[in-house]
């Protein structure tokens, strides 16, 4: 239901895209949503990339095809792991922050104050978060994808002394343009889910400050689960369309 609600709210926030004051608020949200999640997302990508290279390399070495680790890492992170790792990191860091912020505004009746002042709470509070997430999450996904691929290079550099130039030449040979479009679409969908779930959970806060803490926990759990479900659906659809086929 949160995903449908997110799609329903997009027309409501589109008129405010051109307003300078919203862009200023959106830049602040970029720092909160993207920059603050970068260390965790980058470390996760490096760790998972190295482990994936290590495990796949152990099997491929038996067939004398250790250099094929490049293809495994490049395709896995470009199509799947980069966007998913980023979304999970942003979900844990930002869904809770959004839920806590909005929930506190509800408890302290700031939302009602905005309505009394003649301001649309959705335009004032939700639009900057959407803009910040839709801009930042794809950029963060690109950085995490690079971190994961670079971890594969570190493994092969120590294993078979593969040079930086050779490694990344093979990376660009393995990656197709449709793989890039696939991860961009995924990152935009994931950003929408994370912001919408955090916002809705914050709006549902009732009672005292304890309710805000519960809402943040629920926001992280729901957003992470919905991101994984959306990833499965998107990957399945693109597979049926032939976008995930080799060649």
What is the predicted role of each segment?
Residues 1-25, 201-206:
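Short, membrane-interfacial amphipathic segments enriched in basic
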Residues 25, 29-85:
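Active-site cofactor/substrate anionic-group-binding motifs, chiefly glycine-
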Residues 34, 38, 42, 81, ...:
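Selective transmembrane-helix segments that form parts of the transport pathway or gating/packing helices
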Residues 48-49, 190-199, 227-235:
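Hydrophobic core segments of alpha-helical transmembrane domains in multi-pass membrane transport
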Residues 54-79, 145-188, 192, 196-218, ...:
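Membrane-interfacial helix-loop-helix connectors in multipass membrane proteins
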Residues 69-108, 112, 197:
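Hydrophobic alpha-helical transmembrane segments of multi-pass membrane transport proteins
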Residues 83-86, 92, 96, 131-166:
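Hydrophobic alpha-helical segments embedded in or immediately adjacent to the lipid bilayer
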Residues 101-127, 208-212:
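Short cytoplasmic-facing helical segments at TM-TM junctions of multi-pass membrane proteins
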């Amino acid at each position: 239901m949160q995903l449908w609600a997110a799609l329903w709210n997009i027309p409501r926030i589109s008129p405010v895209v051109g307003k300078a004051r919203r862009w200023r608020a959106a830049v602040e949200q970029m720092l909160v949503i993207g920059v603050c999640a970068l260390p965790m997302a980058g470390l996760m990508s490096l760790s998972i990339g190295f482990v994936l290279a290590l495990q796949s390399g152990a099997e491929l070495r038996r067939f004398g095809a250790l250099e094929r680790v490049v293809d495994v890492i490049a395709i896995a992170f470009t199509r799947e792991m980069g966007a998913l790792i980023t979304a999970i990191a942003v979900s844990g860091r930002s869904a809770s922050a959004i839920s806590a912020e909005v929930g506190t505004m509800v408890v302290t009746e700031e939302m009602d104050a905005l309505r009394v002042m003649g301001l649309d709470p959705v335009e004032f509070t939700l639009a900057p978060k959407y803009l910040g997430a839709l801009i930042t999450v794809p950029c963060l996904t690109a950085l995490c994808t690079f971190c994961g691929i670079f971890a594969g290079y570190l493994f092969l550099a120590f294993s078979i002394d593969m040079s930086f130039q050779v490694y990344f030449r093979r990376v660009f040979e393995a990656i197709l343009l449709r793989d890039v479009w696939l991860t961009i679409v995924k990152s935009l969908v994931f950003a929408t889910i994370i912001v919408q779930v955090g916002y809705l959970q914050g709006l549902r806060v009732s009672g005292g400050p304890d309710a805000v803490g519960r809402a943040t926990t629920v926001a992280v759990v729901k957003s992470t689960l919905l991101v994984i479900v959306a990833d499965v659906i998107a990957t399945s659809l693109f597979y049926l369309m032939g976008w995930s086929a080799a060649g």
